[in-house]
Structure formats: structure tokens, C-alpha cells
Amino acid sequence: MSFSATILFSPPSGSEARCCCCACKSETSQGSTGSQGGNPPASTPITVTGHGLAVQSSEQLLHIIYQRVDKAVGLAEAALGLARANNELLKQLQEEVGELRQGKVCTADEDRESRARTPPPEEPGVLKGSPGEASNSLPAMEEECDSVGSGVQVVIEELRQLGAASTVGQGPLGFFAAPQRDARLPGCTLAAVEGAPLLNPMADDYVASEGSIQRVLVPAYAKQLSPATQLAIQRASSETGPESGTKLPATRPEGVLGSAALDSALDESGAGGAGELSRSLGFVGSPCRIRGTGQKNSRRKRDLVLSKLVHNVHNHITNDKRFNGSESIKSSWNISVVKFLLEKLKQELMVSPHNYTDKELKGACVAYFLTKRREYRNSLNPFKGLKEKEEKKLRSRRYRLFANRSSIMRHFGPEDQHLWKDVTEELMSDEEDSLNEPGVWVARSPRFRAQRLTELCYHLDANSKHGTKANRVYGPPSDRLPSVEAQLLPPELYNPNFQEDEGGGNEKGPVSPSYDQPHKTSCPDLNSFIEIKVEKDEYTL
């Protein structure tokens, strides 16, 4: 949608008027001087209404007008998308009303059966009772739906004419300053429609019209959101930047279900225009967008491009302002380093296609400080740092082994799949680096794992690409102890008597720690798989 406007502005002189909003004084003084001097009358200055607005020059006024027109364009496009989505919902309601007009009215017997099954609802407008009562309530419902349909059509037509009306209006440039008004259908809670000029004189008539015109959504679909509506909200939050930091007013308890969650999401994204959009259009929100964002308490991944840029700027050879890991992030030196990095990052990103907010830039700097802090702590205790690094490596390998085994579990029977359903990564083997042969991984199964699950893991490894690698051999059981979560697993997965079984095995004979034939003690009935593995190892060596 394109706009073109010609703005004539002549600021009054200092002797005539001190404020550009005093149009009356400027006009009278300019008219008197024009009539006396014979010069052509000067252009009437444009008056701008707003809260705390003081225009000092014509360039500033043009800039403000451009910002508000651009903001109105984005809101109008998003409003048109919302109106179209609401119109689709209204069509579905009109189809149901059409079926009722054709004579599909509940009979008295059906009403008695429905009353016996379910309690009578409290919402008015539902067809219950005798046929006479149903026939009396049917015309009222038809009139209600007709008024809703006409109201939605008026909204759509006004939104389509919104762009062209921006060059027609001669009034002041006011944006979303009207008080909020509510209009709700009986038996359903709908959002309010806030009156706003929107550069359109027809909007004032729309706000002053009857409440039936303001009804946009219908009760049957008030708790749903169409994909088009979600797309319109996302476009509004992306196109309208953080120009205003106003917060939305708190919704009342009898308000729309999920509207508070949607408004808070728009506020957190920094889109002030989107917040005004939800207030001005009376949009009925739903928490489905929040539920679809991912798992609860999931770890947010950092932007790799931004993290790499922070790393390069901080570790540049010419940079002498670097983080001090021995101090807190709130120390004066580290705060100065963060400010320095923010300035350098903004300079680097001026010609970059990536657009990052100040909050994202600061978060990347703090994340890199935590990395330096961790390096400093590990340097104080090298053994602890190496131990944590080794544990992290083994845990990562267990996760990878668990994912590899789970990917081929669909080829096994239903009994094995049922057993694998409650398996966690803690029950996987520790794939340690061999001390004798570089590049060889020694798989050491946990001692607390049940024998049945151990046999299933051997079968999975024999049928997987990862398990049949030549550089992967089996070793003695691991010394890792079970966690509290592992001790709650069923006996098919967790062996609670693993320490007693280990003691009994030591009485019979010591377990051989050799890596050449370690399988015969842990899984003696799977020698066929082990022999194939040993042949591959001897062939490669």
C-alpha cells in the first residue's frame, strides 16, 4: 500500500507565536501582516495533537508525520488481515444460522432428552424448551447474526479504504487516543473496540455507531485462532518496531480468555504498535502461540553469528579491554568492557544484514563473560576442570548413543519397543577413550543396568552402523553410580541389587579387565557378536 502526501508548512516567527500549536494566533497575525504589506498570505501551519509533543522545526514535524503515517500503514495492513480472518469465522456462523432457517429446530422430545443428559446452560440465545419458545428465540438470533454480519462488512470496507483516506483527512493527526469501549454478545465475552481516527474520518462514525457493529467474533469460535490471524499478529510485531514503550492495561477477570497472555507476548517482543493494535481492534487472543513456541524451560540457543562476532572483537590483537574472570560482571572494569564491546558491535553491524537489538547484543557479551569466568575457575583447579570436561564428553557420547539406538528400535518387535519406552541416556554405556590404543573407544556398560536391557543393547549395536565400528570395543563395566532418577526405574531396566551381584561374582573369580575378551563376563550368551567384533579388530590392526 503506497501513500503520497504534500505538506505545506511555514513556521511562525518568534514575535508572533512561540508555540506551533497556537494556530489561531498565527493565522490572525499572519492575516493582518499580509493585508497590510500586500504580500500573499502564508500557508497555515499544521497543528499536531499529542501528549507532550513540542515541534521545534519543520524537519522535526515532517519526521513525526512520516513516522505516524508509516505506523498507521502497518497497523492497517494487520487490521485488514484480522478482519478477513474474523470474516471467515462469521461465514461459518451464518451457515449454521441458515440451517436453522431451513427448519432444523429441536423438537420437544429432543429437548427433554438433552435436558436429561446435560444440565441447562446459562447462556441466553440457545434453543431450548417448547417449540413455541424455540420459534420465539429464532428470529432474535437471526437478527443478532444479521447485525453481526453487517458490522463485519462495515469493518472490512473501512479498513480497505483506510489507506486512501490518509490523504483526505484534514483534521489533526491523533493516534489511538480515544477511550476504550466494550461491546459483547450475550453469553459470550468479546474484546473491546477502541476508537481511533487512523487518518480516516469514517472511523469516528464507526466508533460512534451502535454496539452491534463493533462485534467482530462469534461465541462459538471465540477461543480459536486461525493461521491467518496468527500471521497477521506476527507481521504486526515484526513491521512495527519498538517506537513506543507503553504497556497494555490490565485485563479484567471477565475479559477474553487468553488475551492477557497474548498482550504480554506482544509487550515482551518490544512491539508497541502491535500492543496498540490489539487494543484498537478488539482482537480475541489465544495462548496457542505461547504453547507452540517449544518445550517449557527449554534452553535458548545463542546466535552463532553474533557469538562469533563477539569472540572476534574481544580477542582482537588490537583490543586491550578484555574481561577479567576473577571479578564479577558488575565490577567497574567488566562493565566498561561490556560498553566497549557494544560500541564495537554496533559499528560492525552497521553494514551487516543482521538486525540485533541492544538486549541481544548485551546478552551475547554477558554469555562470553561467563565463558571467560568458567575458564578462570578451571585454571584455579586444573584437575576439577579436566574432570568436568571428561564428564561432559562422556555425557554427550551417551546422548548420541541413545539417539542412535532409538533410531533403529522401530525395526524390532513390540516387546522390545515397550521395554525401550522408559529407557534414558543414563542407562547407556560410557564410551571412554582407550589408554592403550589412540582413537579407540571402549564401551563400558553401567553396572546397575538390568541384564535384559544389556542384551537388547548388544542386539541394537550389532544391527547399527555405530555399534559395528572397528574402533569401538567393549570393556569392563563402568564405575559410574546411578542417580536418584535411575533408581526409580522399573526392575526390567534398573538392577537394584547390582552391588550384591558384583560381590558374588568376585567370590567366584575376579573379573578380567582385559579389553581383548571382555564380553564373556558381562554377556556370555552373545559370543557370536563378540567373535565378529574381534575378527574386525584383528583385521584392522
Swiss-Prot record:
The location annotated for the cross-link Glycyl lysine isopeptide (Lys-Gly) (interchain with G-Cter in SUMO2) is 128, 223
| Sorted UniProt keywords | Isopeptide bond, Phosphoprotein, Secreted, Signal, Ubl conjugation
Keyword Ubl conjugation on this protein?
yes
Residues with Phosphothreonine modification: 118
**Which stretches does UniProt call biased (Polar residues)?**
232-243
Location of the region described as Disordered in the Swiss-Prot/TrEMBL record? 28-47, 103-138, 232-254, 494-526
Which top-rank group of organisms is this from? Eukaryota
Query: What is the protein name for this chain?
Result: Uncharacterized protein C14orf93 homolog
Species of origin? Mus musculus (Mouse)
